[in-house]
Design a protein with these regions (language model features):
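Catalytic glycan-binding domains that act on GlcNAc-containing polysaccharides
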Residues: 23-195
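N-terminal secretory targeting signals
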Residues: 1-43, 183, 187-220
Length: 220
């Protein structure tokens, strides 16, 4: 394998680790960095990603098996970047290459509008033009930046709340699909808030130090 390819794989492995590694109740740093650039609440971007591709540690271990001895298994459920959804069925893979190879086969059998890819499950039919290639669609940071861009656009269309923007992210036409999706995102947000409050109490013992996740009203 060429030296450049090895370097690329190493950098990508570091990126995935950044997106998975955090305290049990923290939002991983990678999501915070991307969200800040786009003016999206980090908790919203993370909750959307959880809704799209969440995997429990045991499920991640099952996918990875013994393919990467250096991979650090997260202690809690995290979004998984090597995910494809085809016609409503999800597929998880151990590496970017495996996911990309599977996608090439799916694209010969299904229209792009029936395929979602990556850590934030961006639909290739509606938003594939936002990627330079199908390979790029599996880069976790490119996927998250794309998702944050779409969320920002949805927020402008739905200025009442970020929850409505999340529903738009899943189903721009609204209706029952958006409502169901929003309910799942809300559950993730509420859990994140509870966990953050619990952590603050354990570390500080001060209710005044509780983090305030602003995901219903606009963030000033």
């Amino acid at each position: 394998m060429a030296r450049g390819s090895l370097l690329t794989m190493a950098l990508l492995s570091m990126a995935v680790s950044t997106l998975c590694r955090a305290g049990a109740h923290d939002i991983p740093e990678g999501y915070v960095r991307v969200a800040t650039v786009h003016g999206v609440p980090a908790e919203v971007l993370y909750a959307v990603s959880l809704t799209e591709t969440v995997m429990a540690p045991s499920a991640i271990a099952g996918v990875m098996k013994k393919r990467d001895a250096d991979f650090r298994l997260p202690s809690v459920a995290r979004p998984w970047p090597w995910t494809i959804n085809v016609a409503g069925k999800g597929y998880r893979y151990a590496s970017r290459l495996e996911a990309w190879q599977a996608l090439q086969v799916f694209l010969t059998r299904y229209p792009a509008r029936r395929i979602d890819v990556g850590i934030a499950q961006v639909n290739l039919g509606w938003n594939g033009h936002r990627f330079s290639s199908t390979w790029a669609a599996f880069d976790p940071y490119i996927s998250l930046n794309t998702a944050a861009t779409i969320l920002s656009e949805c927020r402008r269309r739905h200025p009442v709340s970020w929850l409505q923007a999340a529903g738009c992210y899943h189903h721009p036409a609204g209706g029952a699909p958006a409502v169901r999706y929003t309910a799942v995102v809300r559950q993730h947000l509420e859990r994140l808030h509870r966990d953050a409050v619990k952590t603050a109490e354990q570390h500080d013992g001060l209710t005044a130090m509780h983090p305030r996740y602003i995901w219903t009203e606009p963030r000033e």
